[in-house]
Amino acid sequence: MNWNTKQENVPKPPPYSKTQSSILQHFLMTSTTSQSSFNYSPHNQEASQTSFNYSLHNQEACMYSGNSNSVSQPLLSGRNYITPQTQISVSNMPTRTIVASQSSMERVVSTNGKGPQQPNHNLQTVSSGIMQNVWLPSHTEATISHNPDGGTNMPYMHPPQNQLVTSDTYSMQLQMAPLHSGKVPMTHQGSQGLNHFIPDQLVDWTQYTSNELSYPEYRPPPKQYSYILPATTSLQVKNNQLPTYTQSLQSKHSVPLSSHQYAAEASKRLSALPYSCRYENQHVQNAQPVSKHLPMEVPQSSEVHSSEKKKDTYRGFKQQWQNPNEKVSIGQFSEVKINIKQPYSESVRPSGDGVQALVQNNQEKRKYTYNPNTNQVIDTNATKEKLVRDIKSLVEIKKKFSELARKIKINKSLLMAAGCSKTANTSYTEPIQHSEFSAKEMSAKNGNDCSMELLATCLSLWKNQPSKTTEENVPKPLEEKQCNTSRISTTVVGSANPTNEVHVKSLCSGVGNSQKMMSSSQTVLPVLIPSCESSGVAVGKGTELQIAVVSPLVLSDTNTLPGKDSVPEVLPETLYPVVKEGSVCSLQTQPTETVALPFDVIGAVASNNISAEIPLPVDKEKQHKPIQGDPDIADSSLGKHSPLGTEVLPKPMDSTIVSGPMLQIESICSLAEGDVSYNSQIAEIFNSVQTEPQKPSPNQVIDSQQEQVYDTTENKDFSLQKDKCVQCTDVPHEVPEQPEPLQPEEPASSEYVEANREATEESCREYTGRKESTAKDVCLPAAIQQDPHPRETDMFSKSDHSLPAINEINDESEPISYLHDQLSELLKEFPYGIETFNRHEVSLDQQKTHKIVENQTGGKTSNVSGDSTDQIKITVLNSEQIKELFPEDDQPCDKLAEPENKEIVAEVKSPCDSQIPREESHDLGMLDPEKDKIHCCALGWLSMVYEGVPQCHCSSTEKKEKDQCLDINSSKQGEQPCNSGITIFEINPVSNNSKTPLTQATEEGHFSAVHGEKTKASKTKDNREGQELACHFSAKCYKKDKKGNFKIRHDTSLKMEQKLKNISSKCDIPNPSKCNKIAAPEILHVTTSNSAKNMPFSKQASQESLQKKHTSQDLGPVKAPIELSSNTDPCRSNTSSVQSVSPEKKKLKFKAGGSRLKYFEKRKTDHVIIPDVEIKKKKYEKQEQNKNAGDTLKLCSILTESNERASVQEKTVPSPESSDPKGSSSKSTRVITVQEYLQRQKDKQITGNNASRNICVETVLCDSGHTKTSKHSAAVSWGKLVEGQSISAETAKELEHNSSSHGKDFKIHHSEASRTHSVSNNNKGKFDGKQPDKMFKNKTSMNNESNQMPLQVKEQRKQYLNRVAFKCTERESICLTKLDSASKKLSIEKKSGEYTSKTKDTDKPSMLEFKLCPDVLLKNTSTVDKQDCPGPGPEKEQAPVQVSGIKSTKEDWLKCIPTRTKMPESSQRDSADSRLSKRSLSADEFEILQNPVKESNIMFRTYKKMYLEKRSRSLGSSPVK
């Protein structure tokens, strides 16, 4: 019966409960707080029983039984009789009393000591007017029978054991009331309304109110007095008013009573019990006495009225509440009032001001109670208002408190995940071990515990707050704080190091943690969170710092683990899902090398280059094991993870490989947070705990990389190298000083440690490389970890015997690509997990910085400088560059770079060379450090500020890749260094070309050329570093990208690339100015192209052909085929294309929003901009002089827009390139994307899209006519080439067009730009007519040759390109999305129309006309622009966006048929949906884009489905939230 009755009520209770929260809030918001209280508190008791239980234990059960009762009858009338209660409340507690009268069943029970019981009493009272009267008497008389009305709930409602439950008659309840007042001030009625709504809002306050209403006796039990007893008065009034109402309430109220002893009513009352049943155990005690009191009365009215009066109760309550229907019970009510008055006044005292006022009002009401329902209403209104205000404030307080509690919980969970990190500060050995095991265990446990939620929070915080804030904030407060967390985090992350005793265990904890981190995302992530923040990669705030730190650490583990063949083979996949964290971590970890050592051993190389992970781990193990035996090595392992300290060093020695992964993460901590937090910790640890280990710690960090284990044993030499590296690292101007201040100052020392780490890593790397051939592998793994550059540096040092290692590393580059690809996938899931690119960027930036410093120092051995560059880049970027050098060092770098730039410009001044060298030399000398700071620090921080951490590492990665490519390029042109961070040491582009044959050994010849160029630029060390890095990059590029020339995949590829470069340089050399000029585009191209090595290769292939065509234009068009033959080999194309296209590309790229030079120019502002303007002017003059120059200028402008897109897509597209140097390319992709995004934003903000179009149009003046003719062919053939090279067709198109024939580049860019900007296209057509024939020939030949690119390269680049492009779109948001979308579409278009494009190379001119499509697409706005603009080829792959008529539209595009209106229409919808889905569903989209679109319709449906699902999720979740 009870359940049935309750079920009757149940339908109402659920709505009531549903409405309770809303009603509660609403009533809390409104004056009917009593009603709200009633609605809300029963609901809360249902939903949040615990909260009510806290405040009122009895209330919980009572509230439920009350809720049931009120739901049964007053549920609907719950609001209604809540209103009557409000009237009653007028006398007592208007807000709550009303609820008490009818809703009092629920509310009053809550009011009583036990949250639910008093509401039950009120519900009972509300159920029957007698109940309410009884409530009042029970309150006054302390009747036990009052509890019976909460009978079922009474167990908690010990005091509320009033006859209140009895809905019989007022007399019965009055009897109950005396018992209640004497026993338990069962003023639940009055307090019920208040109580219930207060329990929701503030149980304590309601408790006080209940105390007021409750008798002084009851006042001692605050739980009961939590309910406002004024409601009791109101309840009394209501009871008096409600005979029928009381009966209905009785029937309703009898349900709780029934639990006591009600016969038939008991069953009905039990319906309320379901809620109170939970508390019935406690209530039962009270229920028995209540039953005793109530058994006779309650059954009558409650049973009689239960069914009848439910409806009546609603009506009666409504009426009574609306009208003063309480006259009938006024007399009794008055008596009760008088009784209640005294307890009320007493309760007023304990209650508090609000309660006192309510009590006073209630007392007054009680005085008036006989007549004044109006008075009650008035009092109720005042009380309601007060209650509402109080409730609102309480609710706000509760919300704040819950938020604070949640934050505390999250922080605690993070700290727990960091695990014994707290102790790590005090004791390294214990915390290290503890944190190690804790990191493992906590990673397994906490990582899962906080994995998704914490991860999401961290990611959101991370994206919300750029790591810049974290790193700037973290450097000082967080550095100390995160010194601890970093220690813990490092310990946990590097727990493998402490566990190095169990080498496998440390691998498990490092790799396993990486897996956990990747899988749990927060297993090690919480631990890694501080580490990542200390890395300064890109972390958010205090807790977010941990979050940000986590992603770098996770990335370190993730990227490293992917590289770890043995252990991480399984883990990489597990970790990759967490790539968002892993991406940053791995990239930064690799730069951090020290922490990444185990990963270096197993996965450090593997992280960047999976293929090398097997050979390198062996070498690393070999090297690290010898070093493992050394305490220094152990120190270095621990040093990586400074918190570990030397105390645990022996353990890391046990398993350096194992410690490597953990250390790698920690290295990230010390670098990312070392700059910010972890490095302070390192400085702290090294200063206080390990003053000496501080140097060894960086050394150890490098040693942890296991390449530098040997060097760690030679801590002195290592320290010297470290200092050299740090000093060499001019980019962090403070870093050079850090070697000494390192120990004294934590932030500086942290940075110093980080810088030393990286410098030491590189120094050890290179030193080891000099020391042993094994060190080569070690160096290579270190280089792999920190990016291809360190490896290349090492390779350069021992390029003769290092080539096999390079080959391995190059193979590892593919793992890096895969890692980045996985990172892309992870980025799908975690769009803000872009930190992967930041990671790489950091390492690249550090390398660049180090190399820049080396260039400036010029006295470092290539080994030391290379290693230092890698490590220092991270150090420079992450440590003080991030916290201090971002604003300071970046500007100083700018200043220094500006003088250097001027000097270099003066040195390399040459019609083309001076322009490019100016920019490039400027970038080379100081722009790279500036870049490092800009990207890793300023730009990286901007990227982080803008959209997470990716920029800094992306820039570093991109710089590294570009530096590598530029190093390759710089053999042809020394200017490239400016554009890419590493290219800093490639300041002299002209000499590079001439010197390429000198060091042609493999990449060494290349590097010799670079070195020669740099020597010209007085940067010998930078040359070596550039050579090494370029060597590594060449090896990487050749290995993976040089699929055309797989015969010499590693050594031969390098040699061939060098030969190609030499040929290029020779080809370019005949025209020194042209070579320089080409070098500039090449560098620019390399900047973007190298960031996307595979994609750049195709682009470079085109660029090479263009360059050679440029040279051919000077030297004859025959060279384009030659270069294109090389171009087939992506690596060769990269080198030769970099050579040929470097000057123009450089200019164009730098001018392009995404171009680093342009970005740096903007960063440098006046000086940089002036060189850029000068370069533009000079380029324009040369443009007038040479078609190539003109094309270059056009490309500069177009690249500003289209190259920005191309760069962004190159940077986003680098995933194809990522497949080879995936880590690097992904980083580059992100970096360029962010830079280009910033640049584009700047450009767009300055000129807007139209301005960009206008610029493109202006620059396309020469290419306009040609664009029309060869635009389609260039786009199509280039799309083929790009497809062949697996480069994003559009990006490759842009780059290739930029390089292939700048006219073509402009055409394609314009076709992209035209698609996105039809105005540009029209102007383009006009302006391009200047030299269409030659350009078209070059473009056509280049496109045809480009189309000849191997399909392997094409497909590889294709996949990554799409995913990266979408990443870029999502990351770049609106502006970049447009450009990216167009470029993406172009690439998709080209891919889709790959075969058609190949067949229709001659038809491309019409396709190049993208006017029609852009016009139509322009109509469709940016979405159509983005997705429809690339119409020609991508329509298939853009099918997700453009479903209807996509195929026909594609054909139309190919045929230049303007039947694209259908497509734009569907595309507009689809494009908008797709673009939205791109932004919102990056993960799904990336997956979809990752795999070429099977069908346009299928793709579109998939995108639409994903988008709709995402939107529904977001929309559905937001209201709930």
UniProtKB/Swiss-Prot annotation:
Transmembrane segments: none annotated. Residues 1325-1335, 1467-1476 have a biased composition (Basic and acidic residues). The modification Phosphoserine is found at residues 910, 1142, 1482, 1514. Keywords: Isopeptide bond, Nucleus, Phosphoprotein, Ubl conjugation. The modification Phosphothreonine is found at residue 996. It is found in: Nucleus. One of its GO terms (molecular function) is histone methyltransferase binding. The keyword Phosphoprotein applies. The keyword Protease does not apply. One of its GO terms (biological process) is transposable element silencing by heterochromatin formation. One of its GO terms (cellular component) is nucleus. Residues 1093-1105, 1124-1142 have a biased composition (Polar residues). Its main location: nucleus. Residues 621-640, 1093-1147, 1204-1230, 1312-1335, 1425-1444, 1457-1485 are annotated as: Disordered. Residues 1214-1228 have a biased composition (Low complexity). There is a cross-link at residues 223, 1411 (Glycyl lysine isopeptide (Lys-Gly) (interchain with G-Cter in SUMO2)). Plays a role in the regulation of imprinted gene expression, regulates repressive epigenetic modifications associated with SETDB1. Required for the recruitment or accumulation of SETDB1 to the endogenous retroviruses (ERVs) and maintenance of repressive chromatin configuration, contributing to a subset of the SETDB1-dependent ERV silencing in embryonic stem cells. Interacts with SETDB1. This is Retroelement silencing factor 1. It comes from Mus musculus (Mouse). The lineage of its organism: Eukaryota, Metazoa, Chordata, Craniata, Vertebrata. The gene is Resf1.
